[in-house]
From Swiss-Prot:
Start-end of each WD repeat: 15-54, 68-108, 115-154, 157-196, 218-261, 267-325, 329-370
Main function: Required for replication-independent chromatin assembly and for the periodic repression of histone gene transcription during the cell cycle.
Species, as recorded: Phaeosphaeria nodorum (strain SN15 / ATCC MYA-4574 / FGSC 10173)
Protein name according to UniProt: Protein HIR1
Record carries keyword Disulfide bond: no
Keyword Nucleus recorded: yes
Keywords assigned: Chromatin regulator, Nucleus, Repeat, Repressor, Transcription, Transcription regulation, WD repeat
Family: Belongs to the WD repeat HIR1 family.
GO cellular component: chromatin; HIR complex; nucleus
Gene3D superfamilies, sorted: YVTN repeat-like/Quinoprotein amine dehydrogenase
Gene Ontology BP annotations: chromatin remodeling; DNA-templated transcription; regulation of DNA-templated transcription
Lineage of origin: Eukaryota, Fungi, Dikarya, Ascomycota, Pezizomycotina
Alphabetized PANTHER family for the sequence: MEMBER OF THE HIR1 FAMILY OF WD-REPEAT PROTEINS, PROTEIN HIRA
Length: 1044
């Protein structure tokens, strides 16, 4: 053995050489890379090192010096294919370089991988370079894609610093060593180049935890660099102990035994920090080729060990003692070792700044076996084979069909990202083609309206178009138009407005998922308000106060001690205090609806005739004894509502003609009495005047004996609610279509959609009627369950409950309510129960929350052909309930962030994920969230969303490998396609699920699952049933195999 240590082979400093922490050899054996405390990654020529004694050698010694870290570099590793070089440092960043510019040694950083919260201690590449794994002092094991360098998974199973990583040469496992005195072995399947974090949720699973050899191991080592033998059968674990003695534990593959009977390498006086197996197998004797052309001699492996005792030992599997032991090889601890690919050159680094090279004579370690012998040995562990075996031609054909459909989807998304395709489809809103308005409308109010009218939730309200909108011009024409846009400055000079690069792109929203908890108000362009999106919800004109409509209740939850009596009339005094400062939120009624007093004061300056608040509404006696009490609107002087739900436009003057501009919108106006009583008695006030106008001309008018609190209407009818609880309805021509309907308390919310009319009273009762059929789908229902009445304590005191952000209707008469605590509810009229559709729990626990996947965010009508023109508050059958689930989830995000609870719940979830027993928490919550979405879409009858969410759910089940759920889901989609003999023939299932044929949904699910070979025993029978795999295809496949 020759020891080579050139003087120039260092990381020089001003006073002394820097400590060298890591080294590695390139797969071609030509380069040595070292990393040290100077923040440099230096690449050396191995040929120059071996010829350092030759003064005639003139070739470059140092090939490159790369400095892209701000601190000490602890680990540096070449990828197995030699294409990349990864380095990890105490700046918690891994830089990846590439040598794709031969023949000059030009190493450039192509990606900075940020994922650790503390120092990165070690790195490792898989045998096929498909993944890079980093470990650090933050106790994390982070898996990165070796192709895209996206983070695939973070493993938080360790409880202390992780200081070593090694990969199985058979490419099935990797092992990590930690200061929690364990080695954890993880099983993985090599991910494809286009793998994403969501695809790999069921990959990289913990296989085994080894603790026995490390129970008394010291925690003073800087590294715990273990190594996997080239035959894949053993792991050499550093910093183990055998009784009181430091040792290297040899762990057996498969059993992972850490028992006292295991093999231990004993001889070092201090803890061993690094072990390194030679990458080659060796014969002890000169190999002899037998008559069959093979070599039948046994092979041995060679392992080098070093650590804090500054000694280096080399062992093989035959000798009980090291066949080489060096004393005082370095002045300080040896930190890393690396073998050359030929297995006969060893490089070592130490904290004294030394970089050592040991060259062994031929036969000194043994006689190297060929690389084919390595592959032959590893083949028994499945090296070179993909997990899962095709079980017949049907499974192969199903897999090909699945991948073909997936490829088409990828090509379509890439085409969208690159701006391919023809003319853009005209926007389809609420089932009818329309022209995109210049301003975004929310609940009938323009985004340019004063801030005094808060909108409870986003809802598009595009203006109806008299004719179908023309197709948009090609992308290049739109770009030219943007380039030529001229603006006028304050000084009157004309200039061409600068154009953002992003504004000229014809590319739509990216279809790549980006899941994060963000407020919809902070997203660019207010994507939730985009008129291209379909939202099947009514557009109430009267807004809600900030924080939602105030509600108070007396809970159902009983206390341990009952409080009897209310002699001091505390209930009445608390109710009166609710309108004073310090009580419940006080809101004023203006012409624009319910607004805060401060906003009303600022708005009064620019309104000619503001709507005055005359007085509070008369309180119904039922309100004082009700468990639920909602804030009652005050009596306003003027209340208006347009037929299309848009913001009422005030009369203006045309700047060009000087003539008055009169809006042509049909508008209902209610004017309550403002003067004094004509008889002298307060109760003898003038009647309320109801008038309907269009283009400034009266269409009809009527009078009501009581003051009006709320009005609503559309193209089918108008309605007004009075302070005595009565509701009146008129046809568009002014006919009273039914007698006055009397409620049990004052109305606080009234809304309409199509022929449906909804009214919520002050005692929390929700009424809904169909004015076309003069019927109700269900009896009046109470809002008490969704106001958390079951969680509040029963007693004489009123309790503040969550406010109502909005209560609206869809075109099918389904009631949708959003709360200020972030929860969203829908009333199921078939089951007579409230169902929670959205809640903050999903926002921090699910990986699918707030996804920007275009298939979820921009749900558009499936009808590309021009549909007949429909009324503004109607949608086509395909778009019933469209957009309701995303709207409720956006409200959840906004309210959750507004209250500040997101930060603390996210901390709780982060702590749970790393806790024992919660390893599958994030995965389970994500699957449950998708199941919740699928069930919600089915309940609402949201056709497009149901198919999208079902597809996402099936993909996740396939990635998780949940065979039980998959089989149950496929069977539920089958319906009557398969009938068991013991099933009753009279019970038949519907062929349609949420507007889709069962066979179509089943076929899509089978094609999605077809690429998972471990699920093909479940999916192949369904593929045969659906005709995805036909007899002709099987014969063609068999003929092809025969020809081969």
């Amino acid at each position: 053995m020759h020891l080579i240590k050139p003087q120039w082979l260092t990381h020089p400093g001003d006073l002394k050489d820097f400590e060298v922490y890591s080294c590695h050899v390139s797969p071609d054996g030509s380069r040595l890379v070292t990393a040290a405390g100077d923040g440099y990654v230096r690449i050396w020529s191995i040929d120059a090192i071996l010829n350092s004694h030759d003064p005639e050698y003139k070739k470059p010694k140092q090939l490159a010096a790369v400095s892209h870290h701000s601190g000490t570099i602890h680990a540096v590793r070449f990828s197995s294919n030699g294409k990349y070089l990864a380095s990890g440092a105490d700046d918690k960043i891994k830089g990846t370089g590439t040598n794709e510019a031969p023949p000059v040694e030009n190493w450039r950083v192509i990606r900075r991988l940020i994922g650790h919260d503390n120092d990165v201690q070690d790195l490792g590449w898989s045998a096929d370079s498909s993944i890079l794994v980093s470990v650090g002092l933050d106790s994390k094991v982070v898996v990165w894609s070796g192709h895209s360098f996206e983070k695939l998974k973070t493993l938080s199973n360790h409880q202390s610093h992780v200081k070593g990583i090694t990969f199985d040469p058979a490419n099935k496992y990797f092992a990590t060593a930690s200061d929690d005195r364990t080695i954890k072995v993880y099983r993985f399947n090599s991910p494809p180049p286009n793998a994403t974090q969501q695809d790999q949720v069921n990959n990289f699973v913990l296989e085994h935890t080894i603790t026995t050899p490390f129970l008394t191991s010291p925690l003073t080592t800087y590294f715990r660099r273990c190594s996997w033998s080239p035959d894949g059968a053993h792991i050499a674990a550093a910093n183990a102990t055998n009784g009181p003695v430091s040792s290297v534990a040899i762990l057996d593959r498969g059993t992972w035994d850490g028992q006292p009977s295991q093999t231990s390498l004993i001889g070092h006086e201090g803890p061993v920090e690094v072990t390194a197996f030679s990458p080659r197998l060796f014969y002890q004797q000169q190999p002899r080729v037998e008559h069959d052309g093979n070599i039948h001699q046994p092979t041995v492996t060679v392992v080098a060990c070093a650590g804090q005792d500054k000694c280096l030992s080399i062992w093989n599997t035959v000798l009980a003692r090291p066949f080489m032991m060096t004393q005082e090889l370095a002045a300080k601890s040896i930190t890393d070792m690396a073998w050359a690919p030929d297995g006969e050159k060893l490089f070592a680094t130490s904290l004294d700044g030394g970089i050592l090279t040991m060259v062994f004579e031929p036969g000194e370690l043994g006689f190297p076996a060929s690389l084919a012998e390595n592959e032959k040995t590893l083949s028994k562990f499945g090296a070179g084979r993909r997990v899962g075996i095709i079980e017949g031609t049907d499974a192969l054909l199903l897999e090909e069909s699945s991948k073909s459909g997936e490829l088409k989807g990828v090509q379509g998304r890439m085409g969208a990202l690159m701006g391919d395709g023809g003319a853009v489809q005209p926007p389809i809103t609420n089932g009818a083609n329309g022209i995109v308005p210049s301003t975004t409308l929310t609940n009938g109010s323009s985004s340019t309206a004063p801030a005094a009218a808060p909108a409870p939730a986003p809802a598009p309200a595009p203006a109806p178009a008299p004719a179908p909108a023309p197709a948009e011009p090609p992308v290049d024409q739109r770009v030219e138009k943007l380039k030529q846009r001229v603006t006028v400055t304050k000084e009157g000079k004309k200039r061409i407005a600068p154009m953002l690069v992003s504004s000229s792109s014809g590319v739509g929203t990216s279809s790549l998922p980006q899941t994060q908890l963000i407020s919809a108000k902070t997203t660019s362009g207010a994507r939730s308000d985009n008129p291209h999106n379909i939202l099947d919800l009514s557009k109430p004109y009267d807004g809600f106060p900030k924080g939602g409509l105030a509600s108070m209740l007396i809970g159902n939850k009983r206390k341990f001690a009952e409080i009897e009596g209310d002699e001091d009339r505390q209930v009445e005094r608390r109710l009166a205090a609710s309108v004073r400062p310090g009580g419940a939120a006080v809101v004023l009624n203006s012409e624009s609806g319910l607004i805060p007093p401060a906003a009303a004061a600022s708005k009064s300056n620019d309104v000619a005739e503001p709507s005055k608040v005359l007085r509070p509404a008369i309180i119904s006696p039922s309100l004082s004894v009700s468990q639920v009490r909602l804030a009652v609107p005050k009596v306003r002087s003027v209340i208006t509502r347009t037929a299309d739900g848009s913001e009422p436009q005030r009369n203006g003057v045309d700047a060009n003609t000087g003539k008055a501009e009169i809006p042509d919108t049909v508008m209902l106006e209610a004017r309550n009495a403002t003067g004094h009583s004509r008889t002298g008695r307060a109760q003898d006030h003038d009647p309320a005047k109801i008038s309907c106008t269009s283009k400034g001309q009266p269409l009809w008018q009527d009078f009501l004996p009581k003051s009006v609190l709320l009005v609503t209407g559309n193209t089918n009818f108008f309605a007004a609610a009075c302070e005595d609880g009565s509701i009146y309805a008129w046809s568009p021509a002014g006919r009273r279509t039914l007698n006055a309907m009397v409620l049990d308390a004052q109305p606080v919310i009234m809304d309409c959609r199509g022929w449906w009319l909804m009214c919520i009273s002050a005692v929390g009762m929700c009424h809904i009627w169909n004015l076309k059929t003069m019927s109700a789908p269900h009896p009046p229902i109470s809002l008490a369950p969704i106001l958390d009445i079951a969680a509040h304590t029963q007693g004489p005191h009123l309790t503040r409950s969550p406010g109502i952000v909005f209560a609206r209707l869809n075109s099918a008469g389904c009631i949708v309510v959003a709360m200020s605590n972030g929860e969203g509810y829908v009333y199921n009229s078939s089951m007579y129960i409230w169902q929670r559709i959205s809640e903050p729990w999903w926002s921090v626990g699910s990986q699918y929350w707030n996804t920007t996947d275009s298939s979820v965010s921009n749900i558009r009508s499936s009808q590309d052909k021009a549909a007949p023109k429909e009324k503004d508050d109607q949608v086509s059958i395909e778009n019933i309930s469209a957009g309701i689930i995303p709207a409720l989830e956006r409200n959840t995000t906004n309210q959750f962030l507004l209250q500040g609870r997101a930060f603390y719940l996210q901390r709780l979830i982060k702590a749970l994920i790393s806790a024992e027993g919660y390893e599958t928490f994030e995965s389970s919550v994500s699957v449950a969230h998708l199941e919740n979405r699928v069930a919600a879409a089915k309940t609402l009858g949201a056709r497009e969303e149901f198919k999208i969410y079902l597809s996402m759910y099936v993909k996740r089940l396939g990635a998780e490998g949940l065979k039980g759920k998959i089989e149950e889901l496929l069977r539920s989609l089958t319906g009557d396609l398969i009938v068991e003999e013991d099933e009753e023939s009279g019970e038949q299932q519907e062929e349609i699920i949420c507007g889709w044929k069962r066979e179509e949904l089943l076929k899509e699910a089978v094609l999605i699952l077809g690429k998972h070979r471990d699920l093909q025993r479940i999916t192949v029978p369904y593929a045969r049933l659906l005709g995805i795999v036909t007899e002709d295809q099987r014969q063609d496949e068999q003929a092809m195999i025969t020809d081969m």
